[in-house]
Amino acid sequence: MDFAQVKDYLVNLQNNIVAGLEQADGGSFRRDSWDRPEGGGGTSCVIEEGNVLERGGVNFSHVHGKGLPASATAARPELAGRAFEAAGVSLVLHPRNPYAPTVHMNVRFFAAIKEGAEPVWWFGGGMDLTPYYGFEEDAIHFHQICKHALQPSGSEYYPRFKKWCDEYFYLKHRKEPRGIGGVFFDDLNQPDFVTCFNLTKSVGDQFLAAYVPILQKRCNLPYGERERDFQAYRRGRYVEFNLVWDRGTLFGLQSGGRTESILMSLPPIVKWRYDWSPAAGSPEAKLYTDFLIGKDWLPLD
């Protein structure tokens, strides 16, 4: 296990992604470095009211502490009470144009440390796409890049991590997926550190290729108040998932993370309506019937 190597990679990844997004948007991200009193810190890069991105954040954090929070030990009670060190890059981008999808990507490394014992470590991460008005070619492109990112590690990873993503980004209280998925993994520590690190790096390194072509294709499509209204309504689902179900958000808040950085994933304009559903056959209804269905977007090998 080489924590310094992982940290160096993550810092460079954040810089590379921000540079790519600034080129795509034409605007600049604000860089905000911060320290965590309990140990560690990070850098948040945020854009608001950009040319294409209404709000977006690319966050790097490296935190450590004496005791793991409850969200980190829920599945592994044997780690309770261990010291921890965690580092990751997490991003969420909310474009202004309703035809351009929201996207989330995260790669992270975690170590639970106890004196006199081997550290327990694992990687996690993934990326997923949340359209408001779906395009099949965009879903296929996104999943193709996800599959391509995992292919060098073995052909078994994409179907496994795709299924995991569909199951994780699911709003149980709404009984609907958050979006059209992608890939998601956690607790990855087999077969060895180098293999797991290489897989995680490949996911991070392929993010721009997965998302920027979709953003560029959709960001200039004409739209009106109707589309913005539906976008704001569907963004409400994003807020619900992040605040109710997301393990990363819960870990950040429970471990004394920086609230501004943790909640930068939330969209700037959101609406809720009581017991609303789109008219049958409308473009808005198509999102539910054709896209939020846990579909296999690529042919199964």
From Swiss-Prot:
Annotated binding of substrate, by residue: 90, 106-108, 256-258
Keywords of this entry: Cytoplasm, Heme biosynthesis, Metal-binding, Oxidoreductase, Porphyrin biosynthesis
Entry annotation: catalytic residues: 104 (proton donor)
EC number: 1.3.3.3
First-tier enzyme category under EC: oxidoreductase
Subunit description: Homodimer.
Full protein name: Oxygen-dependent coproporphyrinogen-III oxidase
Organism of derivation: Nitrosomonas eutropha (strain DSM 101675 / C91 / Nm57)
Taxon lineage: Bacteria, Pseudomonadati, Pseudomonadota, Betaproteobacteria, Nitrosomonadales
Gene assigned in the entry: hemF
